[in-house]
């Protein structure tokens, strides 16, 4: 490819990923059916400290719209009039080893209560059990519905 030729998003990301992005935009614009529509929920905006009524449209595994009324068609619609929605919480410093829980059990406790991400401090396990234990703990987080950064 000549450097003077324009590069498209498909050249960089691949056509399949570009199509996924196009589909998300179409759902957000109300031109394509969403997977899930949460109607009339109270959205907690953690930046502005506001709580307001809105609809949340999901396509696949992504939120594509939080604009009230923008998306009207969905495979599943849930009336969330009595519910709140908020971003997942992040624990910025956690010693997983001192919880005495393996990652799948830790996720079972944290995720339903809103924590979706943890930053894991490995100093104790590294000092007491060594590199192999650190590696095993990191592997144990694979496939667990709790995002972990080490």
Where are these regions (language model features)?
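Histidine-rich, glycine-flanked metal-binding segment
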Residues: 13-37, 42-87
């Amino acid at each position: 490819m000549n450097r003077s030729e324009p590069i498209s998003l498909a050249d960089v990301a691949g056509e399949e990923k570009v199509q996924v992005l196009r589909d998300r935009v179409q759902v957000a614009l109300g031109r394509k059916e969403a997977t899930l529509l949460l109607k009339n929920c109270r959205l907690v905006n953690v930046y502005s400290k506001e709580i307001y009524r809105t609809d949340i449209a999901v396509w696949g595994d992504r939120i594509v719209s939080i604009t009230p009324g923008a998306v009207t068609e969905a495979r599943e619609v849930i009336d969330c009039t009595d519910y709140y929605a908020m971003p997942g919480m992040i624990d910025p410093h956690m010693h997983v080893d001192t919880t005495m829980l393996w990652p799948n059990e830790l996720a079972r406790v944290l995720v339903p209560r809103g924590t979706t991400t943890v930053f894991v401090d490995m100093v104790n396990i590294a000092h007491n059990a060594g590199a192999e234990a650190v590696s095993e703990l990191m592997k144990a987080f694979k496939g667990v519905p709790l995002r972990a950064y080490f």
